[in-house]
Amino acid sequence: MTTEENKTSRNRKRKRQRNPKPSKEEPIETTPKNQNEKKNQRDTKNQQHGGSSAPSKRPKPSNFLDALRERLSGGQFRMLNEKLYTCSGKEALDYFKEDPQMFDMYHTGYQQQMSNWPELPVNSIINWLLSNSSSLVVADFGCGDARIAKSVKNKVFSFDLVSKNPSVIACDMSNTSLESSSVDVAVFCLSLMGTNYSSYIKEAHRVLRPSGMLLIAEVKSRFDPNNGGADPKDFVKAVCDLGFTSVLKDFSNKMFILFHFKKKEQMNSNQKIIKWPELKACLYKRR
């Protein structure tokens, strides 16, 4: 090889050493900067498609707020329910006069509780009325949403602590505006709640005609003497001492008990001292 050829060969070797070709099998290093750029590109792509780089485990806001509202509503219902069972009718009337919205809140909670019952006592009373003459005049003490008046053709006087429609008369149920001996049927459907419940029954006796019917539906646990409730025999005796005769005692339902009484034609001249049993308050536990 000539001197020129050797020189040219050495130059080619130096050039290859200065600019080596990368091996096809050798991985090209990725710098942290490149990794961050790729992550940012992925996050941007996810955001553009409504996605997220990590799935959220939090509940949907609407579901959370609904659950919170339901919990607050349930707590307020329990508070109002306890108040109604532990105060007089006059005190309850004054309370709801100051804040009528509390009455709406109570009845919303009440309807939720009733939705868990397999059978509603108001339907038993409605069926009784439908099976009798529509000419009977009815007084519904503690009418709630006035379902009885909406379900029968009878003339119905609907009483409750607050009136939300013209057909309901707001009053203390121990002192209604009805004339004496003016109605044929008096109804108490889960409404003997005040500490002075006996005065409600006395008012029903006043407004009923002779031979008029008194229909009472109450929570069964209130008449369970083994668990702090009243003895139903004592309750029936007190009502009969007031001037009624017992017609029906129905314990067959799991949730409520039915009493039917008839007003006596004539009252005894000797007034008895009536011993009214204390009815157990029906309080709902927090779930």
From Swiss-Prot:
The keyword S-adenosyl-L-methionine applies. Residues 9-21 have a biased composition (Basic residues). Keywords: Chromatin regulator, Methyltransferase, Nucleus, Repressor, rRNA processing, S-adenosyl-L-methionine, Transcription, Transcription regulation, Transferase. Residues 35-46 have a biased composition (Basic and acidic residues). GO terms for molecular function: methylated histone binding; methyltransferase activity. GO terms for biological process: methylation; rDNA heterochromatin formation; rRNA processing. It is found in: Nucleus, Nucleolus. Residues 1-62 are annotated as: Disordered. Its EC number is 2.1.1.-. GO terms for cellular component: chromatin silencing complex; nucleolus; rDNA heterochromatin. Pfam families: Methyltransf_8. S-adenosyl-L-methionine binds at residues 107, 142, 160, 172-173, 189. Gene3D superfamilies: Ribosomal RNA-processing protein 8, N-terminal domain, Vaccinia Virus protein VP39. Probable methyltransferase required to silence rDNA. Belongs to the methyltransferase superfamily. RRP8 family. PANTHER family: RIBOSOMAL RNA-PROCESSING PROTEIN 8. This is Ribosomal RNA-processing protein 8. It comes from Arabidopsis thaliana.
